[in-house]
């Protein structure tokens, strides 16, 4: 079966593993998934990420992060731009998520960035997802 939206699959796997409090998950790798995983790690939403290379694209191993009492660090993930309805934002219109408590992941000409980085570099692009 052909996957029509690998980014939505990536976010759904993280959301599902987070809901049942798994420590880690493995999923097929791609360049954009690696960039999104690095953003989630840099912003403190996941503990760590590893890349396992093989003959194909490889595998990404994501280590989820929980608070001291077991509360989830990621409370929500939402795919915004979808294959059937792409959502773009100008550099002046890049959205803020929950007044800055969450992040928007934006695919720009300078790579995949958070909303804060896109505003700082004054670039717009495709709004991939919200994470809070």
From Swiss-Prot:
The keyword Chloroplast does not apply. GO terms for biological process: translation. Pfam families: Ribosomal_S8. It comes from the Bacteria. Gene3D superfamilies: 3.30.1370.30, 3.30.1490.10. One of its GO terms (molecular function) is structural constituent of ribosome. The keyword Ribonucleoprotein applies. Part of the 30S ribosomal subunit. Contacts proteins S5 and S12. Belongs to the universal ribosomal protein uS8 family. PANTHER family: 40S RIBOSOMAL PROTEIN S15A. This is Small ribosomal subunit protein uS8. It comes from Listeria welshimeri serovar 6b (strain ATCC 35897 / DSM 20650 / CCUG 15529 / CIP 8149 / NCTC 11857 / SLCC 5334 / V8).
